[in-house]
Amino acid sequence: MFGKRKKRVEISAPSNFEHRVHTGFDQHEQKFTGLPRQWQSLIEESARRPKPLVDPACITSIQPGAPKTIVRGSKGAKDGALTLLLDEFENMSVTRSNSLRRDSPPPPARARQENGMPEEPATTARGGPGKAGSRGRFAGHSEAGGGSGDRRRAGPEKRPKSSREGSGGPQESSRDKRPLSGPDVGTPQPAGLASGAKLAAGRPFNTYPRADTDHPSRGAQGEPHDVAPNGPSAGGLAIPQSSSSSSRPPTRARGAPSPGVLGPHASEPQLAPPACTPAAPAVPGPPGPRSPQREPQRVSHEQFRAALQLVVDPGDPRSYLDNFIKIGEGSTGIVCIATVRSSGKLVAVKKMDLRKQQRRELLFNEVVIMRDYQHENVVEMYNSYLVGDELWVVMEFLEGGALTDIVTHTRMNEEQIAAVCLAVLQALSVLHAQGVIHRDIKSDSILLTHDGRVKLSDFGFCAQVSKEVPRRKSLVGTPYWMAPELISRLPYGPEVDIWSLGIMVIEMVDGEPPYFNEPPLKAMKMIRDNLPPRLKNLHKVSPSLKGFLDRLLVRDPAQRATAAELLKHPFLAKAGPPASIVPLMRQNRTR
């Protein structure tokens, strides 16, 4: 009982210790230093992308504490408030929304198995596997979701944040930072801005004239969509904060803006928060009091969820998908790969939390565009679902990854550059013919199959033009790829995609877009004020590639070539087969 206490085991200090790795963070360069080689591709590739610039005044507001309601199938429960919302959606046309369109072509009939997947996806017009999603900094798996029949609408809840959740504010980008996929800026127009805003003095290269009298183009509801610009003075690149007051003057932005400098437009009339709407209608109506029913109303989370329920498929994808593995993040959600239980096929699943969206109405684009416009050079969507408070989009999985990895770490020859441009222009020519503007063309949005085929993805921020709405005005996109007329807040059309494609060609030649060592706001000012950017390695390209680029990067959008015209350019005759891209993917994997 009182035996001798056991001798304490002595553990020696480490012997022959060598400190081989020391990792730190350079605050000036905003990047990690001394990373082991194995970690570099995991951390640097996503950490170097500049964050989107967001105006918090126009972030979709949420009304917590709404009563929970059961949604069955694909129909929403029609209480009084929801009935008004759904009636608005049914009567909505492209004039009032770029997402919900009455004139959308009907989705093609495709035979589906019980698990919701097409029976023969390879036989569709698409032609092959693709990739889903884009990079970003939002995370959060669904915690609750009903079965394939009944589905509970979850109330407000706190979700675990990703370890790398993106900040809403801007960041200065060093040379090795790349922007997230998604809309970076969208600036609402406060009412009462002085008309006839002139470009700043000392802009010898800007050929865009300002209208002497800018007529307001936006009513009390909806996104501004007519041709007359009424934005702030482009000369100062003054991006006003959203306000319902007509007396706030625009402020000149200096350096990296504050989080409230830039923000998205409200695209859908009934989904726009009141802070983003002007105080007075743009066009005076007939005399008489306004009907209170016509005033924009705040749409609760439950109402928005019920409206989204109408365009997605019923059921729960977890009933036929297994082994979800997160492979990336986008500006709207996370991207996972999953396995179809019955066949073992890999698919990509993009999960977007309705409560974490900068502009939740743009989620309709994630479903509608890929569903309605099918092409062999556009990523194919299989199904879409509401799982709890998340929109899940099931798409084909693209094993080759994004073009960004190739342009950053390898050098492409002209045969390979032409092959990428040909595929992208074939997709854009179809989309532009239908009045769809992508608005975020860049290497991040170009995805590759395992055999080198090129596909266009990331349709969450596209817009629709038509005879009713021939031009758009929202400031949406990634700064370094934006067209000058878009930055100048002039009305634009599909030609902004052509400019962005030209910047992507520079990416493929030089490895990065122009002004990439500048902060986003300064880069936008330089794009707006300067001559079209030139290649750094101009001496290394052929005259045909230079001539092709000169047709893309034209400051006057009226003189810029269309996608259909560019498909006839001699440079595209150099395009190699998809197999010519495979060595680049192999080289990137073995680096």
Swiss-Prot record:
Q: Name one Pfam family in it.
A: PBD
Q: Which residues form the signal peptide?
A: none
Q: How is it modified after translation?
A: Autophosphorylated on serine residues when activated by CDC42/p21. Phosphorylated on tyrosine residues upon stimulation of FGFR2. Methylated by SETD6. Polyubiquitinated, leading to its proteasomal degradation.
Phosphoserine sites (modified residues): 41, 104, 148, 167, 181, 195, 258, 267, 291, 474
Main function: Serine/threonine-protein kinase that plays a role in a variety of different signaling pathways including cytoskeleton regulation, cell adhesion turnover, cell migration, growth, proliferation or cell survival. Activation by various effectors including growth factor receptors or active CDC42 and RAC1 results in a conformational change and a subsequent autophosphorylation on several serine and/or threonine residues. Phosphorylates and inactivates the protein phosphatase SSH1, leading to increased inhibitory phosphorylation of the actin binding/depolymerizing factor cofilin.
All copies of the CRIB domain together span 11-24
What does the record say about activity regulation?
Inhibited by INKA1; which inhibits the serine/threonine-protein kinase activity by binding PAK4 in a substrate-like manner.
User: Subcellular location, in the record's words?
Assistant: Cytoplasm
* Source organism per UniProt: Homo sapiens
What does the record list as GO biological process? apoptotic process; cell migration; cellular response to starvation; cytoskeleton organization; dendritic spine development; intracellular signal transduction; negative regulation of endothelial cell apoptotic process; positive regulation of angiogenesis
Name the tissues where it is expressed. Answer: Highest expression in prostate, testis and colon.
> Which positions are catalytic residues?
440 (proton acceptor)
Q: Where does ATP bind?
A: 327-335, 350, 396-398, 458-460
Q: Which residues carry this modification: Phosphothreonine?
A: 187, 207
SMART domains per the UniProt record, alphabetical? PBD
Listed CDD domains:
CRIB_PAK_like, STKc_PAK4
Q: What is its main location?
A: cytoplasm
Subunit record text = Interacts with FGFR2 and GRB2. Interacts tightly with GTP-bound but not GDP-bound CDC42/p21 and weakly with RAC1. Interacts with INKA1. Interacts with SH3RF2. Interacts with RHOU and PAXI; the PAK4-RHOU complex protects RHOU from ubiquitination and acts as a scaffold to suppport paxillin/PAXI phosphorylation.
Q: What is this protein called?
A: Serine/threonine-protein kinase PAK 4
User: Which stretches of sequence are listed as region Disordered?
Assistant: 95-301
Primary enzyme class:
transferase
Q: Which family does it belong to?
A: Belongs to the protein kinase superfamily. STE Ser/Thr protein kinase family. STE20 subfamily.
Give GO terms: molecular function aspect only: ATP binding; cadherin binding involved in cell-cell adhesion; protein kinase activity; protein serine kinase activity; protein serine/threonine kinase activity
Q: Identify the stretch(es) annotated as Linker.
A: 25-320
